Amino acid sequence: MNLTSPAFGNNQSIPAKYTCTGQNVSPPLQWTGVPPHTTTLSLMVDDTDAPGGHFTHWDVTQIPAATTSIPEGGHVGVEGTNGFGKQGYGGPCPPSGEHRYVFTLKALDENGREVGRGELIAKYAK
């Protein structure tokens, strides 16, 4: 699967608008290539450079398989609790230095098995 954002390219800096120092709104995302036997999608955004190894910024499950995008600040599926202890999106807010934020979209079949995956990496430093 191909996961992209019109707001930033892969391995590029995420605009401050989508971070804790900006408006803290989720960036727009779009994807293609969802496998035919997909029943739901899930999306996870993790800071892989966090002091504890990773920090979850967004956890979305039960996204309908026919969905091909999430608009800026949009809500689809069921949003879980992020690492800040709040439901929904929590923008990048690294304590120091540049951090990588991995957006991972998974396609799941009717048994919850992963049948496809797409990743997009953003970078940010305060």
Pin down the residues of each PLM region:
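N-terminus-centered regions that define maturation/targeting leaders and the start
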Residues: 1-126
